[in-house]
């Protein structure tokens, strides 16, 4: 079998992988085999953590809303607040409620009063 010189194609593939590894250190930046392993591992981690990030932020928002409702005695708990919001068909997502709870807690009172007055 004849030998095929793969100079340009192999170099292009390696430089592409090297561009992904530009912020790595040591052998992870210099050795081609190590670069491919670490870049593949980094892609796996980033793919996994994109899904995890959504869960983590939702947990953070729920924690902030729960803390604010308990401190300011809005509905005594997060679950009662969310239940009454859905029962009265007020459309506020958890991200917006958490932002209101952190930045301006007085607006939580207005939201709770609005929930109580709607029949």
From Swiss-Prot:
Gene3D superfamilies xrefs: 6.10.160.10, Ribosomal protein L20
Primary location recorded for the protein, binned into one broad class: plastid
Protein's organism: Sorghum bicolor
Family of this protein: Belongs to the bacterial ribosomal protein bL20 family.
UniProt GO BP: ribosomal large subunit assembly; translation
Subcellular localization, as worded in the UniProt entry: Plastid, Chloroplast
Alphabetically ordered keywords of this record: Chloroplast, Plastid, Ribonucleoprotein, Ribosomal protein, RNA-binding, rRNA-binding
Protein name: Large ribosomal subunit protein bL20c
GO CC entries: chloroplast; ribonucleoprotein complex; ribosome
Highest taxon listed in the record's lineage: Eukaryota
Role, per record: Binds directly to 23S ribosomal RNA and is necessary for the in vitro assembly process of the 50S ribosomal subunit. It is not involved in the protein synthesizing functions of that subunit.
GO MF, any single term: structural constituent of ribosome
Coiled-coil features, chain-numbered ranges: none
SUPFAM superfamilies: Ribosomal protein L20
HAMAP family named in the record: Ribosomal_bL20
Gene, per the UniProt record: rpl20
Any Pfam family the entry gives: Ribosomal_L20
InterPro entries: Ribosomal_bL20 (IPR005813), RIBOSOMAL_L20_CS (IPR049946), Ribosomal_protein_bL20_C (IPR035566)
């Amino acid at each position: 079998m004849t030998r095929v010189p793969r100079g340009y194609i192999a170099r292009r593939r390696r430089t592409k992988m090297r561009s992904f590894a530009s912020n790595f250190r040591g052998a992870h930046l210099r050795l081609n085999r190590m670069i491919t392993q670490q870049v593949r591992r980094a892609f796996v981690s980033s793919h996994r953590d994109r899904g995890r990030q959504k869960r983590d932020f939702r947990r953070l928002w729920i924690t902030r809303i729960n803390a604010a409702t308990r401190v300011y005695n809005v509905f005594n708990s997060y679950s009662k607040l969310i239940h009454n919001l859905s029962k009265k068909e007020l459309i506020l997502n958890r991200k917006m409620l958490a932002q209101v709870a952190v930045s301006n807690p007085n607006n939580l009172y207005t939201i709770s009063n609005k929930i109580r007055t709607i029949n």
